[in-house]
């Protein structure tokens, strides 16, 4: 690694957490999940795919899908058929604990964060993660200027 690259990496570190960039579908051919390509994952039976997942996700899927998750998968399959016909479909869900499966790749799913629906474009690199990981529920606190009504304690100070 050259010194220029090291400086760029250090600069990224100073910026804090960086939102991952969306990788275009043309570059998906380089993707591998535990040594398997996206095509292999799509053609793989669910039992074999579950064996590739980390323990937490593997245990969750082995116990079976919740009814809400089944409904979401039905919505996704229906949406894929409609999208093949050229229609635009919005998939909204409250299922933040749904594990991203290979059949979801390429879709934009709107995940509820407690206030609004956050659009999440699913790329192959999201496989095995939870939908809720990509729809942040908290907001970074931005404090106002100090003064009257800036804090709860200043409510009791008489205004001049």
From Swiss-Prot:
GO molecular function, one term: rRNA binding
One GO-annotated biological process of the protein: translation
UniProt keyword annotations, A-Z: Ribonucleoprotein, Ribosomal protein, RNA-binding, rRNA-binding
UniProt xrefs under Pfam families: Ribosomal_S19
Cellular component, GO annotation: cytosolic small ribosomal subunit
PROSITE patterns per UniProt: RIBOSOMAL_S19
The UniProt record lists the keyword Transmembrane helix: no
Gene3D superfamilies, alphabetized: 30s Ribosomal Protein S19, Chain A
Record NCBIfam families: PRK04038.1 (NF003121), uS19_arch (TIGR01025)
Job description of the protein: Protein S19 forms a complex with S13 that binds strongly to the 16S ribosomal RNA.
HAMAP family per UniProt: Ribosomal_uS19
The family this protein is said to belong to: Belongs to the universal ribosomal protein uS19 family.
Protein name per its UniProtKB record: Small ribosomal subunit protein uS19
Name of the gene encoding the protein in the UniProt record: rps19
